[in-house]
UniProtKB/Swiss-Prot annotation:
Keyword Cytoplasm recorded: yes
Gene that encodes the chain: pdxJ
Binding site for 1-deoxy-D-xylulose 5-phosphate: 17-18, 53, 58, 108
Protein name: Pyridoxine 5'-phosphate synthase
Cellular localization per UniProt: Cytoplasm
PANTHER family xref list: PYRIDOXINE 5'-PHOSPHATE SYNTHASE (PTHR30456:SF0)
Assembly behavior: Homooctamer; tetramer of dimers.
Length: 263
C-alpha cells in the first residue's frame, strides 16, 4: 500500500505557516508558501492549513488569496474571531475555516478557544461563515464543556488541541493526556461532530493520536517544516502521512489497542 495515497484512512493537513516565517525572516520572496502548498499536495497532503493572524507575522492576505484558486485539495484557513477576519474569510471562500484564540504576544496558539465564555460571539461567527458556504471548525481544548458548547454553536467540526499531550514529560502524564483526548473524541462523536486534532504533533508523538479511530484529520506544520531541513519538503510530507496511516491501520487490526491508552 502507498501510505501517502490512502484517502479515507486519516487526513493530513499540512500547515504552511512556518514556510512563510522563513520567508519573512529575511523579507524575501522565498521560500514561497504557495509553492510549498502545491508540492505538499503532490506528496500526499489532503488539505492545506494556514493561519492568517491579526499581526500578519507569517501568512499574508496576498498568500491566502493567491493560494485559494490553485489548490486541488482544500483550504483550511485558521483565524481569530474578529469581524475583520470573518469578512476576509467570507470574501476568499476557503472550504474550511478553523476559529482559534489569538494573543499578539504569544509565540504560537497557546490554548483552545473558550467557546463557553464567548458563546454568543462564536455562534455569530459560525453563522456568518456557514452563510457563506464555509464549513466551520472550532479549535478547542479536549474538555467536555467546550465540546458541548461547540456543538451548540452549530459548528459541525472541532479540532482538539493536543498541546498538553505534546508537551507532557513523563509516561503518566502522557497516558493521562491520551485518555483525555480519547474521551474528548468520544464526546465529540456523541454530539454529532467531526473531530480533528492538532498542535505540537511531530514524527515521534503523532502515532497514538493518529491511531484513534474517531479522529478524521490531523493538522501539522512546524514539525514538517523542521524535518524538511534534513529530509526535503516532499519527503517530510510523505513520511508524516505514512506514519499517520500506518498507525491508524495497525490500530484497526483485531489485536491492536490504542497505543499508550490503558483499556
Amino acid at each position: 500500500m502507498i501510505f501517502h495515497a490512502s484517502p479515507g484512512v486519516i487526513d493530513l493537513g499540512v500547515n504552511i505557516d512556518h514556510v512563510a516565517t522563513l520567508r519573512n525572516a529575511r523579507g524575501t520572496t522565498y521560500p514561497d508558501p504557495i509553492a510549498a502548498a502545491l508540492l505538499a499536495e503532490e506528496a500526499g497532503a489532503d488539505l492545506i492549513t494556514l493561519h492568517l493572524r491579526e499581526d500578519r507575522r507569517h501568512i499574508k492576505d496576498a498568500d491566502v488569496r493567491a493560494l485559494r484558486p490553485q489548490l486541488r485539495t482544500r483550504m483550511n484557513l485558521e483565524c481569530a474571531v474578529t469581524q475583520e477576519m470573518l469578512d476576509i474569510a467570507c470574501d476568499i471562500g476557503p472550504q474550511d475555516v478553523c476559529l482559534v484564540p489569538e494573543r499578539r504576544q504569544e509565540v504560537t496558539t497557546e490554548g483552545g478557544l473558550d467557546v463557553v465564555g464567548g458563546f454568543a460571539k462564536v455562534q455569530a461567527a459560525c453563522q456568518q461563515l456557514a452563510g457563506a458556504g464555509i464549513r466551520v471548525s472550532l479549535f478547542i481544548d479536549p474538555d467536555p464543556a467546550q465540546i458541548e458548547a461547540a456543538a451548540a454553536t452549530g459548528a459541525p467540526v472541532v479540532e482538539l488541541h493536543t498541546g498538553r499531550y505534546a508537551e507532557a514529560t513523563d509516561d503518566a502524564e502522557v497516558k493521562a493526556e491520551l485518555v483525555r483526548i480519547e474521551r474528548a473524541v468520544e464526546e465529540g462523536i456523541r454530539w454529532g461532530l467531526r473531530v480533528n486534532a492538532g498542535h505540537g504533533l511531530h514524527y515521534t508523538n503523532v502515532q497514538p493520536i493518529a491511531a484513534m479511530a474517531g479522529i478524521h484529520e490531523l493538522n501539522i506544520g512546524h514539525a514538517i517544516v523542521a524535518h524538511a531541513v534534513f529530509a526535503g519538503w516532499q519527503n517530510a510530507v510523505r513520511e508524516m502521512k505514512a506514519i499517520m496511516v500506518a498507525a491508524r491501520l495497525s490500530a484497526t487490526t483485531p489485536a491492536a489497542a490504542h497505543p499508550g491508552v490503558p483499556a
